[in-house]
A protein has these predicted regions:
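A generic structural signal for tightly packed, nonpolar segments enriched in small/aliphatic residues
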Residues: 1-172
C-alpha cells in the first residue's frame, strides 16, 4: 500500500484553495492523504474520496452545542476509505484503487473563512462561501479534482457525512 501525505505548504503550492479555506480557522494543519493499491495487471482505476473533518464546529456559522456534540465523527468517510484500502492491500486484490482523504478541522477564529468570501478550488473554479458549515463539499472538490488530474480514474466514489438538512427533508 503506497502512501503519500501532502502537507499545508504543498497544498498551498498546488492550489487547494477550497480545502485551505475550511482549515483557515484552525491551529491544526490540513493535509491530503493519498493511498494507492496497484497490483501489476489491474486495468481499471477506482478512486475513493473520503471526507476527513476531524472536528466540525461549523466555523463562523457555528453549530449549537447539541449539534456540535458528535462532530468528531465527521470523518467517517475518511475512515471508510482508509479501511477499504488497507483491506484491499491485505487481501491482495487485483483492483487498482486510489484513496484520497482530505483532513481538516473546521473552527471559528480571527483567521477563519467568512461567509461571502470567495476561494479558488484546485479545479480553478471560484466558489463563494455561503455558509462555513457546508465545508464537506469544499474539501471533497479539491481532493476529487486532484485525483482526476493525477490518476484519471475510471470510476470515482465519494464517501461523506454532508449535511444535517437531509434529516429535515427525509426525517430521522
Amino acid at each position: 500500500l503506497k502512501t503519500r501525505v501532502l502537507r499545508e505548504k504543498e497544498l498551498r503550492q498546488n492550489g487547494f484553495g477550497a480545502l485551505l479555506a475550511v482549515a483557515a480557522g484552525s491551529r491544526s494543519k490540513p493535509s491530503l492523504v493519498m493511498l494507492e493499491h496497484k497490483p501489476p495487471k489491474a486495468k481499471k482505476t477506482l478512486a475513493l474520496v473520503g471526507k476527513g473533518v476531524t472536528f466540525d464546529s461549523g466555523g463562523l456559522n457555528i453549530k449549537t452545542g447539541s449539534s456540535m456534540a458528535g462532530m468528531k465523527a465527521d470523518m467517517s468517510g475518511a475512515a471508510v476509505v482508509a479501511a477499504t484500502l488497507v483491506t484491499q492491500a491485505r487481501l491482495k486484490t487485483r483492483n487498482h484503487i486510489i484513496g484520497a482523504i482530505p483532513i481538516v478541522e473546521n473552527m471559528p477564529s480571527g483567521t477563519a473563512t467568512r461567509p461571502g468570501d470567495i476561494v479558488r478550488s484546485h479545479a480553478g473554479k471560484t466558489i463563494e462561501i455561503g455558509n462555513t458549515d457546508a465545508e464537506g463539499r469544499l474539501i471533497l472538490i479539491d481532493a476529487m479534482s486532484y485525483v482526476v488530474k493525477k490518476h484519471k480514474p475510471t470510476v470515482m466514489i465519494d464517501l461523506a457525512t454532508l449535511t444535517g438538512a437531509c434529516v429535515v427533508a427525509l426525517g430521522e
